[in-house]
Amino acid sequence: TRGVVMVFDLFTSNFYLLLSIWIAIPIITFFYLFFVTAPYGRHASTNWGPSMDARWGWIVMESPSVFLIGGLCIFFRANLSSVSLIFVLIYIFHYFHRTLIWPFIAEMDGKKMPVFVAFLAFVFNIFNVLFQCTWILFIANYENSWLTSFPFILGILIFVSGFYINVRSDYMLINLRKAKGPGYHIPRGF
């Protein structure tokens, strides 16, 4: 438990520096991927080491976004306000679907994923959870009046809209594959 507290002390005291580095990583990766093809999906490759079942790779790589954030919020529950609890529950709701529902409705039978890709995504999600928890549990101070504020209501509306679009799009693509078979198809309409 002391180690967990030390990690959050480090994150809290260096939050904006670490966040700046975290934001720089995808910018660097964006340019890097002009020269290297990521070995995932239709570009899957054995050049990146051993592979694993894509469904289980997905579940493993996304799992910190459900279980780690839940565990940390239980561990630091004294730091949770009503508003921050709502933020965490929304976050877990989204990632519960992405982690434990989507992989079982998506067509992934027989597909493989490099273990290295699953590992990198797993590490990414650990850091993402640490940033989210550091902000929600230690830095932000949301009073209950925030629940009726314009930014909160707008944020909830954006989340609900985005979640709906995301899930509906998933099901559209899944149904398109069922109707037209394997391969890549462009959906029409929404």
Short names for language-model regions:
Residues F190:
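Active-site acidic catalytic loop and adjacent metal/ATP-binding pocket
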Residues R2-P187:
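Membrane-anchoring alpha-helices and their flanking helix-loop junctions
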